[in-house]
Regions:
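Short helix-terminus and kink motifs of transmembrane alpha helices
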Residues: 81-84, 115-119
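Transmembrane alpha-helical segments in multi-pass inner-membrane proteins
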Residues: 16-105
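Short loop-to-helix capping motifs
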Residues: 1-2, 64-66, 389
Length: 401
């Protein structure tokens, strides 16, 4: 999830550091209270075995849930005490029987509830206000003006990428203009995804230059590039499957907020949260996933997850959208709806760079096509021109008679 979060403008290193500090503050406060309660402090209650037991409480309760650690602590503490009191009476002798029985019970619990007890209990109890409420009266997030039609948004100049002795991209040149859909196509192994990653900041060119609105971004991280106005989807879907569709899309709008991790952790950002959730809901409706807004992202079909990634990318309000095989796994009607959405975005002035294998989808949609083979550009032009190019036909069909 870190690659995805960085691509959406999240400073993952800083966020993890702040969360670690907050957790340390809570631990320090707990230690202070413990010392005053016991009137005496010694190292034994803070040994490795006790630390593992505390960690086990979180795992059993549900480490991904707010109330999971509390549930796990309650269950393990009560269960251990009950076994210590009950087993000697059953066996008629004292001993560490509870350790064996407790271990077996924990194995069963973790087999039956791999995500912890709290999610299992939540499924058994009717939901009461568990879904996030969309405040229609929340003030919309500010939107940036789109560039003028025809302005060069992204340009790659002589981009080369080497992995040891392998040249994945060799002297690649391309550009994308505002209000245009450009397709980057080629056979498997042509180097499209490598090029895509260099343009979006996930990877760095060995040589050459990448310009975004006239500014060099080669070597810049994907987080910095996202703040400039570029957003993307991924070839292999990158979602947070246990979070709702709404929450996943809200990640895309993160960079449009002003609050830091600390106010968010202590729930001091309610107004901004309402604005971000409203934006996320708008983008979900925009791509046709409104009925799944509060469903877990992992429960959606693969094609719907790809559409969800597009909604998340749009939530960041980009002027350039990079889509990596967005039509893969979609049915015909879903492809048609995606095509209409992309045409609408183009009409609004957005630039779109598309990597796709579905030639029927591409040729009826895009304005220009760049074709790659073995890491090099072999053709560029209008869709009709490219389809008749002998080098393109040879790359795809092995030559023509």
């Amino acid at each position: 999830g870190m690659v995805m979060a960085e691509a959406m403008g999240v400073d993952t290193s800083r966020s993890r550091m702040v969360i670690f500090v907050i957790a340390a503050m809570h631990a320090a406060a707990a230690g202070w209270l413990y010392a005053h309660l016991q009137r005496f402090v010694n190292p034994s209650p803070f040994g490795v075995h006790v630390g593992i037991e505390y960690l086990f409480m979180a795992v059993v309760g549900g480490a991904g849930q707010v109330w999971g650690a509390i549930a796990g602590a309650g269950v393990i503490t009560i269960l251990k005490q009950w076994l210590q009191d009950w087993l000697p009476k059953v066996f008629g002798a004292s001993g560490n029987f509870e350790t064996i029985i407790f271990g077996l019970m924990m194995v069963v619990i973790l087999q039956r509830a791999r995500d912890g007890l709290w999610p299992l209990l939540a499924k058994l109890v009717p939901a009461r206000g568990t879904t996030r409420v969309i405040d229609a009266s929340a003030e919309p997030l500010l939107r940036k003006a789109m560039p003028a039609a025809g302005e060069v948004i992204l340009e790659a100049k002589n981009v080369t990428r080497r992995f040891g002795g392998l040249v994945a991209n060799n002297d690649m040149n391309l550009h994308v203009e505002a209000g245009e859909i450009l397709a980057l196509i080629g056979p498997n192994g042509a180097g499209k995804s490598t090029m895509f990653n260099q343009l979006s900041g996930v990877d760095t060119p060995t040589s050459g230059e990448v310009l975004f609105r006239g500014k060099s971004i080669a070597g810049h991280g994907s987080r910095e590039i996202a703040h400039l106005g570029m957003s993307r989807s991924f070839q292999h879907v990158r979602l947070l499957p246990k979070m709702s569709v709404l929450e996943n899309v809200a990640i895309g709008a993160h960079l449009r907020g002003t609050k830091s991790v600390l106010p968010s952790a202590w729930r001091l950002d309610r107004v901004e949260e309402a604005r971000i959730l409203r934006e996320a809901a708008f983008q979900i409706e925009r791509v046709g996933l409104g009925e799944f807004m509060h469903a877990e992202a992992g429960s959606l079909a693969l094609g719907q997850q790809r559409i969800l990634e597009i909604a998340r990318a749009l939530a960041s309000d980009p002027c350039l959208l990079l889509l990596d095989e967005p039509a893969a796994g979609l049915r015909l009607k879903e492809k048609q709806a995606l095509g209409e959405l992309m045409k609408k975005l183009r009409g609004e002035g957005m630039a779109i760079l598309l990597v796709e294998h579905d030639m029927d989808f591409v040729m009826g949609l895009v304005d220009r096509v760049v074709v790659m083979e073995f890491g090099q550009k072999i053709a560029e032009g209008l869709p009709d021109e490219v389809q008749k190019n002998p080098r393109v036909l040879e790359a795809y069909l092995g030559g023509v008679e």
